[in-house]
């Protein structure tokens, strides 16, 4: 209980900063629920109620604060169903990516939530029927959407700056900055990002497999549930590789454990130096073999 207040406040802060962090709030509640049922700690239901109340309440308090100071009713804003509709439609960048659809629908409805939601529900039904009738299109749509988000190694870190106005001014006039976006430095960065991402994914899979074999703790279940929730959410709702960067950072924790399992198996301390070296060389060969195939493709 000593950690309940600071944990709830930090969770509330994350929800206020980015509403999508409600995914992590749900993951925390699921992990707490599993812990309560497993250990029969029924009083811990208070913890779930408290963290939800603080997180949701803080978000609403921020809105109320702005309304009171401005004297303007901010309304509900764009409902999540509009972002679901956008996530199921085509985009100029990739399937289901940001396409300005949610905002356009809301504005065309004159900020009327009911009208905009009705339009979105109708369009969602049409899209679901199309996915049902054309399995090839459905598989192609979602495979491209998933890969374009999770397999984009820079997570738009360079692109998002490149499309801004300053790129056409001071950046083009600076040789080093221009190289970061278009030249040799750009190629080096993307190769590095690509390699780092690939290693992280491989080690993440090893780390998760090791934790499942070891029996996951409540904390591990919470984090894995959050990652799964983020994956499902951005597969269905409006997508961007930018959005999944936070989940990739969380995956690094599991990757570090995966690396630990690789370089230090049970009998590691009993192995000779030559055996240890062989283990390291085997790992290097696997990684560089995968990397070379990736580059060729």
Locations of regions flagged by a protein language model:
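Membrane-interface alpha helices of multi-pass inner-membrane proteins
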Residues: 4-18, 29, 51-56
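Aromatic-anchored segments of alpha-helical transmembrane domains
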Residues: 12-16, 55-60, 226-235
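Hydrophobic/aromatic-rich transmembrane helices and adjacent perimembrane loops
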Residues: 13-28, 195-198, 223, 233, ...
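Perimembrane helix-loop-helix junctions
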Residues: 24-57
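Transmembrane alpha-helices and membrane-interface helical segments
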Residues: 24-36, 203-211, 227-231, 248-265
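Membrane-proximal stem/loop segments at transmembrane-domain junctions that anchor or position
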Residues: 67-172
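Membrane-interface anchor segments at the N-terminal boundary of transmembrane helices
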Residues: 144-223, 227
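Membrane-interfacial, low-structure loops and terminal tails that flank and connect transmembrane helices
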Residues: 267-297
């Amino acid at each position: 209980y000593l950690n309940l207040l600071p944990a709830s406040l930090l969770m509330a802060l994350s929800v206020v900063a980015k509403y999508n962090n409600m995914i992590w709030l749900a993951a925390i509640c699921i992990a707490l629920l599993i812990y309560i049922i497993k250990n029969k700690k029924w009083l811990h239901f208070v913890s779930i109620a408290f963290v939800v109340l603080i997180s949701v309440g803080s978000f609403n308090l921020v809105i109320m604060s702005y309304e009171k100071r401005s004297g303007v009713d901010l309304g509900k804003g764009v409902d999540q169903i509009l972002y679901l509709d956008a996530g199921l439609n085509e985009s100029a960048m990739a399937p289901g990516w940001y396409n300005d659809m949610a905002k356009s629908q809301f504005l065309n409805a004159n900020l009327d939530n009911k009208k905009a939601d009705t339009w979105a529900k109708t369009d969602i039904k049409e899209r679901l029927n199309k996915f049902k009738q054309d399995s090839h299109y459905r598989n192609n749509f979602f495979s491209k959407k998933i890969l374009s988000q999770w397999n984009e190694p820079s997570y738009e870190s360079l692109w998002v700056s490149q499309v801004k106005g300053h790129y056409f001014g001071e950046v083009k006039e600076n040789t080093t900055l221009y190289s970061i976006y278009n030249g040799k430095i750009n190629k080096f960065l993307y190769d590095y990002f690509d390699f780092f991402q690939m290693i992280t994914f491989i080690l993440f899979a090893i780390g998760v497999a090791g934790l499942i074999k070891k029996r996951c703790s409540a904390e591990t279940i919470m984090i894995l549930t959050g990652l799964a929730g983020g994956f499902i959410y951005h597969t269905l709702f409006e997508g961007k590789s930018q959005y999944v960067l936070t989940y990739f950072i969380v995956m690094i924790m599991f990757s570090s454990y995966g690396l630990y399992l690789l370089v230090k198996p049970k009998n590691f301390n009993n192995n000779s130096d030559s055996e240890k070296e062989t283990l390291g060389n085997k790992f290097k060969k696997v990684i560089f073999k995968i990397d070379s195939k990736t580059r060729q493709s």
